[in-house]
From Swiss-Prot:
InterPro entries: Ribosomal_uL22, Ribosomal_uL22_bac/chlpt-type, Ribosomal_uL22_bac/org-type, Ribosomal_uL22_CS, Ribosomal_uL22_sf
Gene Ontology MF: a single term: structural constituent of ribosome
Keyword Ribonucleoprotein: yes
Family the UniProt entry places it in: Belongs to the universal ribosomal protein uL22 family.
Function text: This protein binds specifically to 23S rRNA; its binding is stimulated by other ribosomal proteins, e.g. L4, L17, and L20. It is important during the early stages of 50S assembly. It makes multiple contacts with different domains of the 23S rRNA in the assembled 50S subunit and ribosome.
GO terms for biological process, alphabetical: translation
UniProt-listed PROSITE patterns: RIBOSOMAL_L22
Name this polypeptide is given: Large ribosomal subunit protein uL22
Subunit: Part of the 50S ribosomal subunit.
Keywords of this entry: Ribonucleoprotein, Ribosomal protein, RNA-binding, rRNA-binding
GO CC terms in record: cytosolic large ribosomal subunit
Organism of this sequence: Halorhodospira halophila (strain DSM 244 / SL1)
Amino acid sequence: METQAKLRFSRVSPQKARLVADQIRGLPVDDALRTLEYSPRKAAEIVRKVLESAVANAEHNDGADVDELRVARIFVDEGPTMKRIQPRAKGRANRILKRTSHITVAVAED
């Protein structure tokens, strides 16, 4: 049985979040949490919280054994982009894109 958790509109670039997601795809949950705990990336903390939520969902909703869970699927989709303006010299302006992500983590028993 596959159980999932989603985080939408997270303020992290999808490109950076995918680097973290690729590291834990297919790993047992214990190994994945350990990997995320020692990763220096901002996205690692965000993905760790989503993974912990998916594990809690599996335990509470499906009665799954936490020790048998693994990361079945994890993917990061692009959310809406906030457009901001940064003033420059001589009356000009540059556009700043603040990107968001939708992170989905699915865990399943072996």
